Amino acid sequence: MCASALQVGLYAQQATKLSPKLSPKVMAVVNAPLVELKDDDPSLLRLEKERFNAALKEAKARFDLHNRGLTRIPELIAVSERLFGAEVDLYDKPERKAEVLQRQLDVYIEAEANLQKQVSDGLATQADLERLRFNKFSVEIDLSNAKNRHGDHESKAQPTP
């Protein structure tokens, strides 16, 4: 049992040395504050806020585990999907949704470059990189759709001459 614990400790130390520092955009997401719950929040909004806060707490915990070499990249990708998805659901206005999606896309673009380097260095798998790329393309599609809906909404709101 002691040998097993020692092996886990050594693995964590080695993984920590190999784990690259998180990018500024990722750190901004991880360091974001929890959303304040208000007594007069409608029940659905309250649930959406609680879900976002749970996702943010999980993200903070998973990134802490990553920094200690105790979690894998797919878990970080999955938690980021949940976190950004929960944040998008907090907003009704298409332009606010688009802002969140743009931030998510910016994080994924930065993460893709970092992950590509890790794959080249043998520290991550090609499968992890392709999963991130799939998610990035999905966000690009969602962002394009959100911008098109926002543009359609604005053009319909404009009076005709």
Please state what every model-predicted region is.
Residues 14-24:
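Compositionally biased, intrinsically disordered low-complexity segments enriched
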Residues 23-37, 80-85:
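Short, charge-rich amphipathic alpha-helices with coiled-coil/heptad character
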Residues 1-12:
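Sec-dependent N-terminal signal peptides
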Residues 84-98, 137-153:
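Amphipathic alpha-helical coiled-coil segments
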Residues 44-84, 97-139:
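Charged, solvent-exposed structural "stalk/scaffold" segments
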Residues 31-49, 87-99:
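Short, charge/polar-rich alpha-helical segments
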Residues 159-161:
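Short, solvent-exposed mixed-charge patches
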Residues 125, 152-157:
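Short, solvent-exposed, mixed-charge loop/turn linkers that connect secondary-structure elements
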